[in-house]
Amino acid sequence: MTDALSIARDLIRCPSVTPADAGALGVLENALNAAGFTCHRVTFSEPGTADVDNLYARIGSEGPHITFAGHTDVVPAGDESAWSVGAFSGEVKDGFLHGRGAVDMKGGIACSVAAVLEHLAANGGKPRGDGTGSISFLITGDEEDVSINGTIKLLKWAAERGETFDHCVLGEPSNVETLGDTIKVGRRGSQSGTLYVDGVQGHVAYPHRASNPVPDISRLIVAISDEPLDHGSAQFQASNLEFTSVDVGNKANNVIPGEARAKFNIRYNDNHTQASLRELVETRLAKACGNRIKARIVWEPSNSNVFVTKPGPFTDLAVSAIEEITGRKPELSTSGGTSDARFISSYCPVIEFGLVGQTMHQVDERVPVKDLEKLTQVYRGILTRYFG
């Protein structure tokens, strides 16, 4: 069966807890091969990480080229005894499809595959009746964890083969409360770092022989984070810097520590680049340290840069398709955390539209069967408009 519900159930029954595949990519590969796609299974490796399988499938050789992206790996089920049905049973109960990945995001992938198969069947097995156009799938098994051997490498692999993409739909659960309420058109960037403050270790009874870094790091945390980084932009909320831990590595209560450190993360908008953001924080630190406090920031490598797909013909056709099927005009949003769209945005404009995310990563993750049907129709509408 190639309807969205059947595909989603088959995918959920593959316990593909990241980074395991457990047969999930095979479900998709079989369906796409049968429809005339050329499929490539690509395995990527990195020292210290698990090897991960990925799938690239394409039909057509000309433009315009639209690609559907997603991930088949899922987070662990947690306490499976707490589930009302088996976490990997793919059971339909009271009009809902239950199972880990039903929302995030095997359900969305199933809808995109079902929509593409229906579209091809209506057009003589081709993306467009005149034989032009291309449709592809970029599917990874490495999104829920480190995201090292997944989409970022699959895109590079495809580019090295001469593949180019005009537009992408990523089927992440973008909607907040109801199907049709939100399209994600961008994401803030993410940058992490650790603040280190030097002190001099010593006995608490002789503070004059030591230098306590704890009061100093407290002052620096306030100096760095108290003033807003900005006040937002036309398409993004304000950037925010949040300290997430403070530690001195000291288990003795009679020893002044020799060093203090604090971890932080910044979510930043298009008022900043990664370089300008780091410079802003470093400037605040230097001013607060003066000539007395010795401190430094160690920045973590980051490939989560800010991006936005600006309103235009592609977002317009997506909004039109969503409004026709759901009766709602979606908000073009840049809220939320990071996704693989941050990698895709370097290759082509990308939007995120999938299911409602309320139960993702929860016990009894589930999606209304009617939402699977509607999302399939939305994707059909996008394809019809795209190749119309």
From Swiss-Prot:
Zn(2+) 1 binds at residues 71, 104, 172. SUPFAM superfamilies: Bacterial exopeptidase dimerisation domain, Zn-dependent exopeptidases. GO terms for molecular function: cobalt ion binding; succinyl-diaminopimelate desuccinylase activity; zinc ion binding. GO terms for biological process: diaminopimelate biosynthetic process; lysine biosynthetic process via diaminopimelate. It holds the Pfam family Peptidase_M20. Keywords: Amino-acid biosynthesis, Cobalt, Diaminopimelate biosynthesis, Hydrolase, Lysine biosynthesis, Metal-binding, Zinc. The active site is at 73, 143 (proton acceptor). Its cofactor is Zn(2+); Co(2+). The keyword Hydrolase applies. Binds 2 Zn(2+) or Co(2+) ions per subunit. Zn(2+) 2 binds at residues 104, 144, 361. It catalyses: N-succinyl-(2S,6S)-2,6-diaminopimelate + H2O = (2S,6S)-2,6-diaminopimelate + succinate. Belongs to the peptidase M20A family. DapE subfamily. Homodimer. Catalyzes the hydrolysis of N-succinyl-L,L-diaminopimelic acid (SDAP), forming succinate and LL-2,6-diaminopimelate (DAP), an intermediate involved in the bacterial biosynthesis of lysine and meso-diaminopimelic acid, an essential component of bacterial cell walls. This is Succinyl-diaminopimelate desuccinylase. It comes from Bradyrhizobium diazoefficiens (strain JCM 10833 / BCRC 13528 / IAM 13628 / NBRC 14792 / USDA 110).
